[in-house]
Amino acid sequence: MANSLYQKHIISIPELSREELELIVETAGQLKKEPRPELIKNKVVASCFFEPSTRTRLSFETAIQRIGGDVIGFDNGGNTSLAKKGETLSDSVQVISSYVDAFVMRHPQEGAARLASEFSNGVPVINAGDGANQHPTQTLLDLYTIAETQSRLDNLNVAFVGDLKYGRTVHSLTQALAKFNNIRFFFVAPEALAMPDYLCEELDEAGIQYSLHTDMESVIPELDILYMTRVQKERFDESEYAHIKSAYILTAALLEGARENLKVLHPLPRVDEITTDVDVTPHAYYFQQAENGVYARQALLALVLNETL
């Protein structure tokens, strides 16, 4: 297929087609098997993180260098002169984009990536997270990991557990998987952290099966993918948090009735929601998932910066 990702802004998952998602997943798999260290040789990529990040920033910068690109940028935008001097985001983007071939950006403000794409002078902007809005490259590595472990992206039973209300990774991955066939979702959360109504309405309109649960153990035997998330302590008082947290802790014992092919994923960092005894089960795949971020981001950068590979 033609590479429709060439020079495209990567702002949100709904703007990517199934075919584009499949192309990224396929390319990531190829690059994992056969490294291509000169794919973006002589290209310069800005890595601009206006809020602190560890995994996403290091993963992106590793990906850039592994396929031959050069990286410039910063990892804490609040400490840069452009922030201290009060420069607007649009002005910063116009200046930085004149130096580079692609612009990777994380920003605490929802909608910042889209704003950046309007002022980047045609330089493709890749959203590395904009507030609680979207985190599309996390979704790409999640999709690649699911395809790698299940050998398919159709015909899957997928559960999301924990903070489904505020978790941008959950929202984006749900929207991505909804583009595939015969997906069934299990949303496991306390009522206070249930999946947002707008996403459930999107699934209803598309005729996609889903069910709401407050108990994790009962759904595990039906699953191909169990996607755990962290319940954020700051959203509850102490007693309420303790109750909710204890209800959604995955242990090795809970996985005894799971399908052989079940993989446990987590966007990390984990706190208490997956016990360390799960790490040594054949179901644990969250550290490999994090590693796959490098391959998914290599694939995305290569496709955005090359008309053909």
Curated annotation (Swiss-Prot):
- Record keywords, A-Z: Pyrimidine biosynthesis, Transferase
Q: What assembly does the database describe for this protein?
A: Heterododecamer (2C3:3R2) of six catalytic PyrB chains organized as two trimers (C3), and six regulatory PyrI chains organized as three dimers (R2).
One GO cellular component term noted in the UniProt record for this chain? cytosol
User: Its catalytic activity?
Assistant: carbamoyl phosphate + L-aspartate = N-carbamoyl-L-aspartate + phosphate + H(+)
Task: Summarize where carbamoyl phosphate binds, as residue positions.
Answer: R55, T56, R106, H135, Q138, L268, P269
Q: Which NCBIfam families match?
A: asp_carb_tr, PRK00856.1
Example GO biological process: amino acid metabolic process
- Put simply, this protein is called Aspartate carbamoyltransferase catalytic subunit
* Pfam families in UniProt: OTCace (PF00185), OTCace_N (PF02729)
- Its Enzyme Commission number(s) read 2.1.3.2
**EC class:** transferase
User: Which family does the record assign?
Assistant: Belongs to the aspartate/ornithine carbamoyltransferase superfamily. ATCase family.
Q: Which residues bind L-aspartate?
A: K85, R168, R230
Q: Which organism is it from?
A: Vibrio campbellii (strain ATCC BAA-1116)
* InterPro entries in UniProt: Asp/Orn_carbamoyltranf_P-bd (IPR006132), Asp/Orn_carbamoylTrfase (IPR006130), Asp/Orn_carbamoylTrfase_sf (IPR036901), Asp_carbamoyltransf (IPR002082), Asp_carbamoyltransf_Asp/Orn-bd (IPR006131)
Q: In which pathway does it act?
A: Pyrimidine metabolism; UMP biosynthesis via de novo pathway; (S)-dihydroorotate from bicarbonate: step 2/3
Which is an annotated GO molecular function term of this record?
A: amino acid binding
Per the entry, what this protein does is: Catalyzes the condensation of carbamoyl phosphate and aspartate to form carbamoyl aspartate and inorganic phosphate, the committed step in the de novo pyrimidine nucleotide biosynthesis pathway.
Gene name of this polypeptide: pyrB
